[in-house]
Swiss-Prot record:
Species: Carapichea ipecacuanha
Subcellular location: Cytoplasm, Cytosol
Residues at which S-adenosyl-L-methionine binds: 193, 216, 236-237, 250
Pfam families (UniProt xref): Dimerisation, Methyltransf_2
Protein name in UniProt: 7'-O-demethylcephaeline 7'-O-methyltransferase IpeOMT2
Pathway named in the protein's UniProt entry: Alkaloid biosynthesis
């Protein structure tokens, strides 16, 4: 094993640079959160063309004494790739377009959720959690589970639902175009944990003869209104799931332990007809091996797996781990359909 003394100066400098990049990367995200709170992406969009610094500063809700500091914030955000700068004017990059508040496909709420103090504090408590018997670092930080916290904080619940809805917009676009065949022949579908119905609305629109039901906790669907072939039903997936030809679980199971996943899947199995009548469960989840095969350069399932541990004491799963869950829940047939990088559509049959 090499030691610091045996390493060359060049190697040590590269190591120091690597650590500096990692340590200071949080500043990019804190600066991005600031930009969203100030409305910088939307200000540029509303302007209709690239904005110079004076125009941008005048459009922002800031104290006049802070105007001289905006150029330093923008320099950081340009380097991070969220904005472009040319001839002293700032514009949105393709990445920045995903930050617009009123665009149906956006990750603005997801960014604000991930940088919310409620989600940052458990990471600070991570080492403490390893030394105690709390279920999760989230419990160590807040004294309650993620779901208890969410149910007691309406504003946080709203942000969480908005973040999930933004994610669903992109997934729904892919589903109803490239994977339309998954829903063909179905007469009824229940979207379990479907929140405000973003995904189910897209499916209902693409398939007018398919009766779609969003099934979620009362606080998630209380203010939602059905329309045409879409309705909302309140309930708990651990108690029962409404009957349908197919049950949809979009990024639900990775939030739960193996034991709870089996409970959810068993309830789904009770609610669909047999394989000979076309009954199935449609799962959208990450599969660890697919990410390795894709060679994705971006932060992926290893990051998400850590977040699942920190928030829920759950995890991302391999094909082998998924297969065991399906078997334990009583499903005899399943197939993995690669969709987006490490994300898969998994079809289960009784």
């Amino acid at each position: 094993m090499e030691t610091v003394e045996s390493s060359s100066s060049a190697e040590l400098l590269r190591a120091q640079t690597h650590f500096s990049t990692q340590l200071f990367s949080f500043q990019n995200y804190a600066s991005l959160k600031c930009a969203l709170h100030l409305g910088i992406p939307d200000a540029i969009k509303q302007h209709g063309k690239p904005m110079n610094l004076s125009e941008l500063t005048s459009a922002l809700p800031i104290n006049p004494s802070k105007a001289p500091y905006i150029h330093r914030l923008m320099r950081m955000l340009v380097k991070a790739g969220y904005f472009a700068q040319e001839n002293e004017c700032f514009d949105l990059t393709p990445i920045g377009l995903l930050l617009l508040k009123d665009d149906p496909i956006n990750i603005r709420a997801l960014v604000l959720l991930e940088l919310h103090p409620a989600l940052l504090m458990p990471w600070i408590a991570l080492s403490e959690w390893f030394q105690n018997d709390d279920a999760t670092p989230f419990v160590t930080a807040h004294g309650k589970s993620f779901w208890d916290y969410t149910s007691r904080d309406p504003e946080f619940r709203k942000l969480f639902d908005e973040a999930m809805a933004g994610d669903s917009e992109l997934i729904s676009k892919v589903l109803v175009t490239e994977f339309k065949y998954v829903f063909e022949g179905l007469k009824s579908l229940v979207d379990v944990g479907g929140g405000n119905g973003t995904l189910a609305r897209s499916i209902a629109k693409a398939f007018p003869n398919l009766k779609c039901t969003v099934f979620d906790l009362p606080e998630a669907v209380a203010n939602e209104q059905g329309d045409g072939n879409l309705d909302f039903v309140a309930g708990d997936m651990f108690d029962r799931v409404p009957s349908a030809d197919a049950i949809l679980l979009k990024i639900i199971l990775h939030d739960w332990s193996d034991e709870n996943c089996v409970k959810i899947l068993k309830n789904c199995k009770k609610s669909i007809p047999g394989k000979d009548k076309g009954g199935k469960v449609i799962i959208i989840e990450g599969v660890v091996e697919l990410e390795k095969n894709a060679g994705n350069e971006y932060a992926g399932l290893e990051n998400l797996d850590m977040e699942m541990m920190v928030l829920y004491n759950s995890k991302e799963r391999t094909k082998k781990e998924w297969a065991k869950l399906f078997s334990d829940a009583g499903f005899s047939d399943y197939k993995f359909i690669p969709a987006l990088d490490s994300w898969c559509i998994i079809e289960l049959s009784p």
